[in-house]
């Protein structure tokens, strides 16, 4: 036993080493087991459960975010193609209507021309018929005049 | 004259006197066990209250205990390493809590008001037996950690960079517990003595900053003890390449 007097202590002293040492060691070891079952294990379980919960949620959120981004990009390309498609359809329809308009215009023009021609021909034939009739009447009249003049003589 | 009276007054501080318990042939320092039982009882009550109803959303005491747990885990993990820190966390945490509770309990509770037939109550860590017990436990732990993790290869550590290190590393096995125990013992005892002497000489105001300093020292010593214990264990289980 290491022991010496310090400031007049009658026995013991500061460096009085005795059975307190092993008993204290046993007490600390016992305390380790008690604290392990009372404190470290239960608290660790709760904390690690929560940490797992949080990290799981973060991973899930990240997955969802990337999914959303993918969907967004997908939608964007879809929108783009829909836009070009719409433009194509619009221009096609425009061309179509243009063509139809031109066709209709041509048809109408032709019809109008034809009926104009027909009218002209009719007018012409009527004019010539009238002229023929007129010249025939003039002939008859002149013959009548001639006959009268001859008869009076 | 003055010095003489100071000496007798020091004697009134009862340095180095113990409350002896005689059990059969063995003698114990009763005051150490009394204070440690009171303080550890308080610690256990505190912890059982805090862990009584554990919830996923921590409230009140559970918050504090979880903070403590996290603090100890960080300490163990940084010193021992990711691989085996789980096995040693309860031991490191117990060392930290025991030393911390003992130091602060010794500094905060006015034990002096309780009169004992001999000796006086104080921090259990101000007794050399306690600190040597803790230091020897640390020594055993790091030997056990090294041997159980690496088997006989643990002894490679002694000749690690070169065999020249062998005597120094062997010497270290003796200086480690020695420095651990004497650092803690010296700091806490010195703090108690300084506060005791100051309270005796100037009972008003002056001891208060020293008491705060004592609280600071107490917390730091607990941290140092736990950190060094973890570091020694980490050193023993570390793989050399």
UniProtKB/Swiss-Prot annotation, chain B:
GO cellular component: a single term: proton-transporting ATP synthase complex
Keyword field contains Thylakoid: yes
Domain of life where this protein originates: Bacteria
GO molecular function: proton-transporting ATP synthase activity, rotational mechanism
Protein name, as recorded: ATP synthase subunit a
Keyword NAD: no
Principal subcellular localisation of the protein: membrane
Subcellular location: Cellular thylakoid membrane
Assembly, per entry: F-type ATPases have 2 components, CF(1) - the catalytic core - and CF(0) - the membrane proton channel. CF(1) has five subunits: alpha(3), beta(3), gamma(1), delta(1), epsilon(1). CF(0) has four main subunits: a, b, b' and c.
Membrane topology: Multi-pass membrane protein
Alphabetized UniProt keyword annotations: ATP synthesis, CF(0), Hydrogen ion transport, Ion transport, Membrane, Thylakoid, Transmembrane, Transmembrane helix, Transport
Pfam families: ATP-synt_A (PF00119)
HAMAP family: ATP_synth_a_bact
Protein family membership: Belongs to the ATPase A chain family.
TM segment ranges: 30-50, 91-111, 128-148, 193-213, 214-234
Purpose of the protein: Key component of the proton channel; it plays a direct role in the translocation of protons across the membrane.
CDD domains: ATP-synt_Fo_a_6 (cd00310)
